[in-house]
Each structure stands twice: as C-alpha cells, then as structure tokens.
Amino acid sequence: MKFARPHENRKVNGNGNGNGHRRTKRQPGISEVAHEAPKDGGKLIVLTAPLTEAIDHAGYFIQMAMASLPIWMEGVINKKYPKWRDLEKNEDSSARYMPAGVRLVETSLLREYQKDDIVACFPEDLHKFVGPRTRVVAVSTHNPLGVTFAAGVYTSIFGSSRMPINSHYSRELFASIKGSPYRNNFKVIVGGSGGWQITQTDSFEELGVDCVVEGRSESTDTLDLFRKAIRQEELPRQIDVKHPLDREGILFPDSRTPSA
C-alpha cells in the first residue's frame, strides 16, 4: 500500500479561520451522506475509534483535557490547538495512523482474515467502507459516556454540562453507525478501556452495541467472537476473553501505521 505524503490527503475539520471560537460543523454520519454503496460491497471488518481518540497517534497531551472538559469548552481547545483535527489518510481513505489498540486488533485478525477484508478508518469515512458485505464494525473507546471520576470533577467545576468532549464524539460515532443503511447486516463490537461504561449503564440499545469485549484482542475467544459475528450469529452482551496462555500468543502491533 502506498502512503500519502503528510501534506496530501489531510482533512482539516477546522472552521476556516482557525480562531477556534466556535465549534466546527459536524461531519455527516453514514445515514446522512448521499449514500452509494462501496463498489466492492464494503469491507468485511471495519475498525474505528472516536475522532478524539483517533488523534492519540500524535501524542497529544490534550487527550486528558478532552476526556474531562465539558463539550461547551471545546472552543478553548480549538483556539489553542486549531489543527488537532488534522487527519492523515492513505490513498484509499483508510487511516494512516490509529491508536495502538486498534492496530493490535488488526494484527490479531490478520492471523485469520485477508488484508483486503479489514480496514481501519476514521469516523467520517465509515460510509466508504461499510456496505452490504460488512459483518463487523469494531469500535475502540476509552470514555464513551463520560462517567469517570475525572470527568465528574472537571465538569462540576466548569459547568452543569457533564458530557466531556470525547464522550460527545463517541456518541456521535455510535449514532452514525446505528444509522447505517446496512445496520441489520453487521454486529457492533466494542473494546478498549471504556467498555465497562456501556456494560454498567446498560447502554447497549441506546448506542446500538451488540457486544462489549473485556480482555486482549489476540485471545482465541476474541477470534471466535468475530467468527460468530461474521456468521451473523447472536453475540453475548458482554464477554471476558481469556488471556493468551503463552508468550507466543501475545501480539504487538508493528507500528501505528498499517503494514506496507
């Protein structure tokens, strides 16, 4: 796969003047795009993460602020870091960079599935990869509902709105997936350190989530879960997967960029 140079295929969701005083226009969801099915029918497995977590590849320390500050204070972040939404993409619109956790899922799945069956993409590009052939949309999320202690402390200090910035973008992502015209064809599997928030608040129906996975993606249980999803079988609401039993079973992503 040929990678675009840094100045190519970059999408800046800024407001044009870079002053950050108002929120940028939200990117349309899958159901809001003048939809045309992907020519290849879509990818079998689509991996993604909320925008505020997908930028983790750049080492932004503002991750902590986005996980805690209420959404109405997003303008402060926009003003201080007007380019935080810059996204680097490959020529096919897949994500050039993704958090290591997403790449680990990708590496784990490549033990069993073909490279052309899997893609990692940013939320705004889901409509380019989710189609009638798609059977799994897997989401990695850290703070989907904003129910962490830190979020409660900061939002109580700065105002009555208790929804942190990254929770806003997480909900936006889940709403987009839920509105997909192909939603009945695929399962939504959630992993990452924030999955417990969905389980403990029983937000499965609200967010359109089929299954929350706790544990390592390279587990044989995780691969079995994806097999069931691809066969369109019913999935458990929540599953604790077994840890690999030997050193060889533990995988690490080579990088946060996909392999060439």
Predicted segments with their positions:
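A short, charged/proline- and glycine-enriched loop
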Residues: 34-45, 132-133, 256-258
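Short N-terminal binding/cap micro-motifs at the start of the first secondary-structure element
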Residues: 52-61
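Short, charged N-terminal beta->alpha structural module
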Residues: 83-112
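Glycine-rich beta-alpha loop elements in corrinoid/cobalamin-binding modules
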Residues: 101-104, 117-249
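Radical SAM [4Fe-4S] cluster-binding motif and immediate context
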Residues: 245-260
